[in-house]
Swiss-Prot record:
Transit pept. (range): 1-47
Biological role stated in the UniProt entry: May be involved in the activation of fatty acids to acyl-carrier-protein.
Organism: Arabidopsis thaliana
Cell membrane recorded as keyword: no
A GO biological process held by the record: fatty acid biosynthetic process
Gene (name only): AAE16
Annotated Pfam families: AMP-binding, AMP-binding_C_3
Annotated protein name in UniProt: Probable acyl-activating enzyme 16, chloroplastic
GO cellular component assignments: chloroplast envelope
SUPFAM superfamilies per the UniProt record, alphabetical: Acetyl-CoA synthetase-like
Keywords for the protein's UniProt record, in alphabetical order: Chloroplast, Fatty acid metabolism, Ligase, Lipid metabolism, Plastid, Transit peptide
GO molecular function, one term: ligase activity
E.C. designation(s): 6.2.1.-
Keyword Transcription regulation: no
Enzyme class per UniProt: ligase
Length: 722
C-alpha cells in the first residue's frame, strides 16, 4: 500500500531550450516546431508529464515506537493499541530492572527492560529491511528463550502476524501449518532444526527468507539453496543501521504511518488438542491486551519478583502470562523440565507458571523422598502431614470454602453448629499443625523453592495434589482457559482459593452451563457444557468459517467442549464464600459410553489411580465395551521395590519382574485407589513406552492425547477385550 503526493512543474520549451514552472500537481511542457521547409508556419506543442512521489506505508506500534516517529505521527496518549506497546510503559517504570535471564543458551543472556526494548526495536527495523510487510504471515518455529520473545514482539510490531509452533513438532505438522497459514518467511530456533526441515520446505513451501535465532549459518547443510538465510545478529545489525540513519537524517518523513488496530490479528496459534486436526486460532491484539490488563486481579505480581518459565513460550497460556508479568516489572528466568528441579532451589522464584502435571510430579517426588527415609522419619512425616490435611479441611469448613452442588442453602442453626464444630476441631489440631510446619513443611517448601504461589493452567489439578500443597503451605492457583479464549477466562484468587475449582471468571467475561443435548441453560449446581462470552474469545479459526460457526454462536457464546458447573450462591454454610466459582469435570468428548448405555467420565478414575506410586501414566478406555479397561505405564522402579518386600529372599535375586506380575500388582493398586469411584476398571494393558511430546502421545502442555493413544494400541485393545 502507498499514498501518493503530487509535486509537479510547468516546462516551456522552444526548440532545444525551455523554462520550467513548478505548479502543484503536474509538470506541463510547452514547445513549438517547424512542420516542413516549404512553410514558415510553426506548430505549438504541449506535453503533460506527471511526477509522482511515493510514500511507503509503515504499520507500527505507536506507543512502542513513539520516540522514533515524526512529531505529527506520534501517539499523544499512553493508551496501548497493540501488544508491543507495553514495552514503552515498562521501560518508563522499570527501565534498569532485570527483565529476563536466559542462562541455558549460547551465549547466556540477561536484559534489563531498557535493553530488551532496544533489542525489540532493532529487530523490528531489521525485519522491515529484509522486506517484512504489514499483514504478512511469518512462521515462528522455536522454543522458549529471550530471542523468541524479541522475535515474537518484533513481528507483531511491524503489523505482521506471527504463526507459532515449537521445534519439537513433526516436519509434516510444521509444513501443514506453514502452508495453511500462507506464511511467507520462517524464523527458526537454530541451524540443527532448520537442517531437519529444510528439504521438505524447499520443495513444497520455499520461504522468501529464513532467520536463525541461535547458532551460526556455518552450521547449515543447505548451502547452494536460493533462500536467503540471516542470523539473529544480522537482523539486529540491519535494524541498528536503519535506526541510526533515521536519527541522522529526516528519512522517517518519507513514510506514511499507520497505527496497528487493536482488532488486527496479532498471532495465529494452531491448537494441538487431545483430539482432531489442529486449527488456526486467530487472536487479536485486543484479545491479548485484555489478558494483560486483567490478570493482575488473580496474580498480584510486584516489581522485582522472580518468575520461573518452563512452558513453551508459543503456547497461549505461557504467552499471556509472560506479556502480563512484563507490565509488572518482574524478573523472568527461562528454564526447562531438565533444569526445573535445580532452578527451583537455586532461583527460589516467587511464582512458577506451569501445568498440573508439573505439580503432580513435584508431589510424587516429595512422596518418594519421604518413602526413602528411615521408618521412624517416614512415620512421623506422614502422620504430621495427615494432621495438617485434617486441619486445613476444618479451616475450609469454617471459612466457607467447600464446594457444593446443593442449590438450597442449609438452615442457619445447622450452619452455626457446623461452623462451631470445625472451629473446635481446628483449635485442637492447630498445635500439631504448627509442629508439622516446623519439622516437615518448611523443609518441603525449601526443597520446592516456590516462595509465593504456583500458578497452574491447562487443566484441573487432581484434588489430592491440591489438598497436599495447601496442607504444607504452598499456594497453588488454578486457572482455566483455551487457546480460543486467549486463554485465561477464570482463575482462583489467593484470597478465595477454592480447592477443586478453577475460580471466578475474569473481568467482563460471562459463563453459562447448558444441557449437552438440548442447549437449555442450566441452574447453578447442574453439570453441563461450559460456554464463555467476552473480550478473550478469539476472532475465529483461520480460513475455516464453518468450524468457527460450530463453536461460536450468533450471540458470541463460545462452546468450550468442557463439562462443568457453577457453584450456587449461599449466604450460610460451608460454601458461603465460594458462590459463582467454576468447577470442571472433564471434556465432553472424553466421556466413555459403555455398551450398556452408561456414561463414564474417565478423569475421576485416572486422578484416583495416579495416587498410586506404581502407576506412572494411565488412560481409561472402554468405548462401546461392556466394561472399562485401562492402558497403564507402570513405574517399574517402584514396582520392583514393592515386589521385593513381598517375595522370598531366594526370589529377590530376580532382577526383572514379568509383565504378568506387574499387571497383577497394577490391578491391585487400581482396585485399592479407585474403590470409591463410580466405576471400576476391568482389563489392564501394560505398555513400556511412556506417553511423551516427542512420540506425539502428549500435547505441548503435557496432556495425554487419548485418540492417539487408543489408535496406537488399537490391536492390543481388541485382544484385551476378547
Amino acid at each position: 500500500m502507498a499514498s501518493t503526493s503530487l509535486g509537479a512543474s510547468i516546462l516551456v520549451s522552444h526548440c532545444s531550450s525551455a523554462p520550467e514552472f513548478q505548479v502543484s500537481g503536474m509538470r506541463l511542457v510547452f514547445g513549438y516546431k517547424a512542420f516542413g521547409c516549404r512553410t514558415s508556419r510553426r506548430g505549438f506543442r504541449v506535453r503533460c508529464e506527471s511526477k509522482i512521489q511515493e510514500k511507503e506505508l509503515r504499520r507500527c506500534s505507536p506507543f512502542l515506537e513513539r520516540l522514533s516517529l515524526p512529531r505529527e505521527a506520534a501517539l499523544s496518549s499512553n493508551e496501548w493499541k497493540s501488544v508491543p506497546d507495553i514495552w514503552r510503559s515498562s521501560v518508563e517504570k522499570y527501565g534498569d530492572r532485570v527483565a529476563v535471564v536466559d542462562p541455558y543458551h549460547d551465549p547466556p543472556s540477561t536484559f534489563t527492560y531498557r535493553q530488551l526494548e532496544q533489542e525489540i526495536l532493532d529487530f523490528v527495523e531489521g525485519l522491515r529491511v529484509v522486506g517484512v510487510k504489514a499483514d504478512e504471515k511469518i512462521a515462528l518455529f522455536a522454543d522458549n528463550s529471550c530471542r523468541w520473545l524479541v522475535a515474537d514482539q518484533g513481528i507483531m510490531a511491524t503489523g505482521a502476524v506471527n504463526v507459532v509452533r515449537g521445534s519439537r513438532s513433526s516436519v509434516e505438522e510444521l509444513l501443514q501449518i506453514y502452508c495453511h497459514s500462507e506464511s511467507v518467511a520462517l524464523v527458526v530456533d537454530n541451524p540443527e532444526f532448520f537442517n531437519r526441515i529444510a528439504e521438505s520446505f524447499s520443495y513444497k513451501a520455499a520461504p522468501k527468507f529464513v532467520i536463525l535465532l541461535w547458532g551460526e549459518k556455518s552450521s547449515l547443510v543447505t548451502a547452494g539453496r536460493h533462500t536467503p538465510v540471516y542470523s539473529y545478529n544480522e537482523i539486529k545489525k540491519f535494524g541498528q543501521e536503519r535506526r541510526a540513519k533515521f536519527a541522522r537524517s529526516n528519512d522517517s518523513g518519507k513514510y506514511e504511518y499507520e497505527y496497528i488496530d487493536p482488532d488486527d490479528i496479532a498471532t495465529i496459534m494452531y491448537t494441538s488438542g487431545t483430539t482432531g486436526n489442529p486449527k488456526g486460532v486467530m487472536l487479536t491484539h485486543q484479545n491479548l491486551l485484555h489478558q494483560i490488563r486483567n490478570l493482575s486481579d488473580f496474580v498480584p505480581a510486584e516489581a522485582g519478583e522472580r518468575f520461573l518459565s518452563m512452558l513453551p513460550s508459543w503456547h497461549a497460556y505461557e504467552r499471556a502470562c509472560e506479556y502480563f508479568i512484563f507490565t509488572c516489572g518482574v524478573e523472568q528466568k527461562y528454564t526447562s523440565i531438565r533444569f526445573l528441579k535445580d532452578d527451583l532451589k537455586r532461583y527460589q522464584p516467587h511464582y512458577l507458571i506451569s501445568v498440573p502435571l508439573v505439580y503432580e510430579t513435584l508431589y510424587s517426588g516429595i512422596q518418594k523422598q519421604i518413602s526413602a527415609s528411615s521408618p521412624a522419619r517416614k512415620f512421623l512425616a506422614l502422620t504430621l502431614i495427615k494432621v495438617s490435611l485434617a486441619y486445613t479441611e476444618m479451616k475450609r469448613v469454617y471459612e466457607g470454602l467447600c464446594l457444593t452442588k446443593n442449590q438450597k442453602p442449609p438452615m442457619y442453626i445447622v450452619s452455626l453448629v457446623d461452623w462451631l464444630w470445625a472451629r473446635v476441631v481446628a483449635f485442637f489440631l492447630w498445635p500439631l499443625h504448627m509442629l508439622a510446619e516446623k519439622l516437615v513443611h518448611r523443609k518441603i517448601r525449601s526443597s520446592i523453592g516456590i516462595t509465593k504461589a504456583g500458578v497452574s493452567g491447562g487443566g484441573s489439578l487432581p484434588m489430592h495434589v491440591d489438598k497436599f500443597f495447601e496442607a504444607i503451605g504452598v499456594n497453588v492457583q488454578n486457572g482455566y482457559g483455551l487457546t480460543e479464549t486467549s486463554p485465561v477466562v477464570s482463575a482462583r484468587r489467593l484470597r478465595c482459593n477454592v480447592l477443586g475449582s478453577v475460580g471466578h471468571p475474569i473481568k467482563d467475561t460471562e459463563f453459562k452451563i447448558v444441557d449437552h443435548e438440548t442447549g437449555t441453560v442450566l441452574p447453578p449446581g447442574s453439570k453441563g457444557i461450559v460456554k464463555v462470552r467476552g473480550p478473550p474469545v478469539m476472532k475465529g479459526y483461520y480460513k475455516n468459517p464453518l468450524a468457527t460457526k460450530q463453536v461460536i454462536d450468533d450471540d458470541g457464546w463460545f462452546n468450550t467442549g468442557d463439562m462443568g458447573w457453577i457453584t450456587p450462591q449461599h449466604s450460610t454454610g460451608r460454601s458461603r464464600s465460594c458462590g459463582g466459582v467454576i468447577v470442571l469435570e472433564g471434556r465432553a468428548k472424553d466421556t466413555i459410553v459403555l455398551s450398556t448405555g452408561e456414561n463414564v467420565e474417565p478423569l475421576e478414575i485416572e486422578e484416583a489411580a495416579m495416587r498410586s506410586n506404581l502407576i506412572q501414566q494411565i488412560v481409561v478406555i472402554g468405548q462401546d465395551q461392556r466394561r472399562l479397561g485401562a492402558i497403564v505405564i507402570p513405574n517399574k522402579e517402584a514396582a520392583e521395590g514393592a515386589a521385593k518386600q513381598k517375595i522370598s529372599p531366594v526370589d529377590s535375586e530376580v532382577n526383572e519382574l514379568s509383565k504378568e506380575t506387574i499387571t497383577s500388582m497394577v490391578y491391585e493398586e487400581l482396585r485399592k485407589w479407585t474403590s470409591q469411584c463410580s466405576f471400576q476398571v476391568g482389563p489392564v494393558l501394560i505398555v513400556d513406552e511412556p506417553f511423551t511430546i516427542d512420540n506425539g502421545l502428549m500435547t505441548p502442555t503435557m496432556k495425554i492425547r487419548r485418540d492417539k493413544v487408543v489408535d496406537q494400541y488399537k490391536n492390543e485393545i481388541e485382544r484385551l477385550y476378547k
